[in-house]
């Protein structure tokens, strides 16, 4: 798959739609940042403190006790889940946009929560997270590979729901794994091609993200469209 063509297609689609794309992408990014900020900071501090306690006692066995890992989760977990759903809304909204449909501002922001998507998106997201975590216990690389295997899950859930098909907890995960067979490297390289844009965004104190988010999301939606076509839109 030619990534230059995917990016060019995204630029052409955004040419007369930057106002809509920037506004909806900016607001969703704010929501994601808001819901992720506290859990990330608190979670990091909690983990560091827990590990310090373990090292202080000299008992590494504590790392393998359920109580240790249970302590890493709390109220912030709910905020993380909500933040992830706004990320899923971003995926759904720009998939519709890549297909020529501009969702209204509010419908776009909450697209993962509406039209019957919430439960299947949540179940497949949760199962995908668990599977990826279990693979990561082996080594970092297997977990990374699985993250690319499951990368098309939210797109597939959207299409299955829109076509009226029944979506179980692992339906889209399995479909994504099959769809990405032989294409994980292509998506990895596509992601790498945005590194320059991310560096520029950091150097501009985040201003560059205003353009990067719609550009990247539209490009990835086109990647999915090229890969899946209307396969999951058919009953």
Residue positions per predicted region:
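Hydrophobic alpha-helical membrane segments
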Residues: 1-235
